Structures are given as C-alpha cells and as structure tokens.
Amino acid sequence: ETHANKAAHQVQLKILKTYYEKFGNTIAIGMEMFTRPYQPFLDQWVAGEIDENKFLEETHWDSEWGYDYYLYKDILDFAREKKIPVIALNAPKALVKMVSKNGLKGLSEEEKKQLPEIDTTDNFHRAYLERAIREHMVDRTADLEKYNDVQNLWEEYMAQSIVNYLSSWEGKDKKFLAFAGNGHIIYDFGIPEKVFRRSHLPYYTIYPAEFHGDKPPPEHDLFLPEIPLEPADFVWVIPPLVEQKRIYLGVQLQKKSDNKLVIQEITPKSPAEKAGFLVGDIISSIDGTAVKGVPDLVHYLQKKKFGDTCIVEIERDGTKISYSV
C-alpha cells in the first residue's frame, strides 16, 4: 500500500472480499499498522467485544500509526463482520528506537535477545535503501547503516510475526493477506523474502502503483536500473493521492493532569470561532458522547459530512454551555 492513498486501501479491500468469497474463514489478515503487543485488542475487536473508540484507544492508533483511521476502517469493519483474524505484525516502538539509536552492532547481548534473526547482507536491498536516503533525506548518507538496520528490523519482525501465526494451530493452512507499505514488499527483498527464508511458503506480491496516465515514468521505483529484479508479481495501477478536505472544529487542545481537554488556540474563521468558543474552554462532550481525548474528537468528526451540525458541550468558569457547530 501507499499509506495515505485511499485508492490503495480500496484495492486491499477488494482483494480481501474476493479472498473471503473464495476461501471463507480459512483466511487471515496481517497488518503493519499494529505492533505485536496490541494483539489482544485486535482479537477483541474481531470478536465484537470492544467498540471502535475503545479499540482505537487501546491500540494507540494516533500515536502509534498516525494515518487517518478512516483509510483502514472498511478493512477492519469487514474483518470484524466476517470474524477474520487480524494479526499485528510490527515491532514495538521501543525496539525500533533502540536499534535506531545504537544500530545492530551497538546493542548488548541482552538487547539482541529481544530481536528476531536479522539478515542485513542483501546488496540489492541496501541499494534500494541507499537510493531512498539519497532522494528523501538531505545529507543523511552517514545514517545509512542505522537506516538499513531499522528497515531490516521492521521487515524481519513482520516476517517473523507472519510465520509465527502460520505455524500456530489457529493459523495452520490459512491463506494470509499481509497489508504493508510498498517499500516493504517491492523486489521481494523485504517481508516476502524474509518470510520465505523462514518457511519456504509460496507467495505473491501485489504493488499498488501511483502514476499519471497509462505508463509510469522511467524513474519510478518499479524500474530501478541498479536492481535487476522483478519488482512485484502484480502491479495494480491506482490514481495518485488526492488531498482531501478534512472536517475540523479549528481548535488546538491540551489534555491537563485532570484529563480535561482545554482549548489552547482557536483558528480564525473556523467553526469553533464562529460558534463562540473561547480559549480556556473545556470540551466535555459532542452530541452527548463524552470526549476523553483528542482522538475521540477527531474520529467522531470524521463521521460527519460537510454541512452537518453537532452539539458540543463545553465548560467555562464552572458553567456548562452547549454550542451548535
């Protein structure tokens, strides 16, 4: 996938639905977006034991992943509806931070025990990452070793998560759809090769490619002269990312020690300013639903359409006031 492109996620959903129609409950989904410690909450989500707000809160969606949840909502809703297992693939942030800071060679023996088996010797993989640094990170060539280490950590960890599941009693003989960024599957040297090294299971890769017109430009990642490999088994052409307008109140919030959400700043000419909100107001609920954190407010607003209204209850100097916004 291209994380922020809705068209890529529509491709994923289409493939998921087709697989479900053909294979029923013998499929499972793996998602880069979740780190392995949050697996219990994915299980609870699929089982229908927690609602969406609780699910997003417990998996720390906004701080852990950060992309718009509504890009992924249809996939996760379908998994819940059909009881399709969703497997958390990614490495915990603490491990990533540790390797990013010290590199693999700078870790103690105790620290290395927390990691999967990691192979950083693929020269084509390294060439791809070096190009990414050169094109996207100004004057960062000195960080190539650590960047290579972190990328391999992510991919080895996700590969190990996939193999762990497919080797388990519940994952045995299942068809597995792994949803991850294009950079982790292109040319096979990321997740695909690392899964195969561990399991020798057959696989296909599908690369959703963004470009204008009928043909990609020659400098596209799919056609790198320094990497004489097939970029993917299938390339699915999708339209380029289109910036979408977001529904917003127009406030900057801060969560205080007593868990109250206090307005720190109001955007000029925003819905909040027009409604009469003031800096220092405390937002307590929206349409009767308690707002416990910024993610609650953001995700609720994304359910709205342009032209809709909502009732926001605020607290000002000990008095509760309701505004129609």
Functional labels for PLM-detected ranges:
Residues 2-24:
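Zymogen propeptides
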Residues 272-294:
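Conserved PDZ fold ligand-binding element
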Residues 27-34, 205-208:
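Short internal beta-strands
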Residues 2-5, 34-38, 92-96, 182-185, ...:
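Solvent-exposed loop/turn segments at secondary-structure junctions
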